[in-house]
Amino acid sequence: DYETEKLSFNGRECNLNPDPAQIRNDISCLVSYLSSLNSFYGDVQQAQRDYYAFMNWYFASLFMPYLRYMANKNSYEVTLFPVVGIIYGESNGGKSTFLRMLSKLMCNAKIPLNATSDFSASNIEKLRCGCEGVPLNIDDLDKDQFRNHSGRIIKDDVWGIAEHFIN
């Protein structure tokens, strides 16, 4: 709740002033994960930069609906605040593990990854409304499923604005 400066998840109020030891533990997890990419092949430094950029978007994504609403209200471009993030890469590259870690760090809960069949305009609409701004994580998205539905999902620049959907 932006006005009362309180955050709740599944009806439970979250502590917005976490214990410094927990913060250090979370940072240690992130550093350990990003360092583990050193054993991968290819452009490791670019992969680390990409994962770091995605991580920052992921944590900020909770605020994107509100930022989009305020941008629209004040005649700014809503596409500056994307509500869709995509990680693409080779199989067994650690993407699913990365998403599980991010959702655990963000919500202090294990949030299941969605199936490729959830990636359709109608399913995504229902999931978005129910997830209160928490990112949807679709695991191993099938290329045909992506090709058939991505345009309507990714290019939906006005989603949630008219409904004042701000989490």
Model-inferred region functions:
Residues 66-167:
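Conserved NTP-binding/hydrolysis core of motor NTPases
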Residues 46-73:
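N-terminal pre-Walker A segment at the start of P-loop NTPase domains
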Residues 1-48, 65:
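Extended, charged/polar low-complexity intrinsically disordered regions
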Residues 27-31, 55, 159, 163:
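Hydrophobic core segments within long, regular secondary-structure runs in both alpha-
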